[in-house]
Regions:
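Metal-dependent phosphoester/phosphodiester hydrolase catalytic core
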Residues: 1-167
Length: 167
């Protein structure tokens, strides 16, 4: 292991970033779902997050905005819990980061919130530490996210209207 250095760090790198930009520019899909191993929006330090790579994170956000690409959402995992974070912007639509990562490895014993208690981007009641999975339903006018426990019982329901994901 080496010390994490935030100067010029990248999760995607040049080749994958070029591919992502091209795919976004050439997509005619209503929804463009980008799946990352780490959260894009959670700004709390001390865990794997795109905030550990600020230049690359900003490059992605700026590219989406500068090119007015509608319908972009991010899916992530690797937190041993599930949650939804939404980052609101003045000049473009809210960016959603749906995290689901607790079906096979839930957070063992949650030892308190620490800095994450004050996470202003988290959607109320979306933080789930028990075994769960998310069912995504794609409709022409909205995306529906249903987080369910391992027995299939609904734990949390969230919808994102398509009209909320555009310019």
């Amino acid at each position: 292991r080496t010390f994490k250095n935030n100067d010029g760090s990248a999760l995607l790198g040049n080749q994958q970033m070029a591919w992502l930009k091209s795919a976004l520019l050439n997509s005619s899909s209503t929804y463009k779902i980008i799946v990352l191993g780490n959260q894009l929006i959670n700004a709390i330090d001390g865990h794997e997050s795109y905030y550990d790579c600020p230049e690359e994170r900003q490059e992605i956000m700026r590219f989406i905005n500068d090119n007015e690409i509608p319908g972009v959402l991010f899916f992530s995992g690797d937190r041993h819990h599930s949650e939804i974070n939404v980052e609101h912007h003045l000049n473009y639509y809210p960016i959603h980061d749906i995290t689901c990562s607790a079906l096979s490895s839930p957070r063992p014993k949650f030892r308190g919130w620490g800095k994450e208690r004050k996470l202003s981007t988290r959607v109320d009641n979306s933080f789930i530490t028990k075994h769960n999975y998310c069912v995504v339903t794609v409709n022409s006018d909205c995306l529906v996210f249903k987080f369910k426990n391992k027995s299939g019982r609904l734990l949390f329901n969230y919808s994102v209207p398509q009209k909320e994901l555009g310019y």
